[in-house]
């Protein structure tokens, strides 16, 4: 019974942690792509996007 409780607590703790890591990675990748697209736009002054 104690092992079951331990695994349950571990799962409850890990789920938000893993979700936070995934969201952080998505946000970080978005920031990186924004930086790269900003650099690309600076290299091409003829476009108005």
Curated annotation (Swiss-Prot):
It comes from Escherichia coli (strain K12). It is found in: Cell inner membrane. One of its GO terms (cellular component) is plasma membrane. Part of the AcrA-AcrB-AcrZ-TolC efflux pump, interacts directly with AcrB. This is Multidrug efflux pump accessory protein AcrZ. One of its GO terms (biological process) is response to antibiotic. Belongs to the AcrZ family. HAMAP family: AcrZ (MF_01484).
């Amino acid at each position: 019974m104690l092992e079951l409780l331990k695994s349950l607590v571990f799962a409850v703790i890990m789920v938000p942690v893993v979700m936070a890591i995934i969201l952080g990675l998505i946000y970080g990748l978005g920031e990186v792509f924004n930086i790269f697209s900003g650099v690309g736009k600076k290299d091409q002054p003829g476009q108005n996007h």
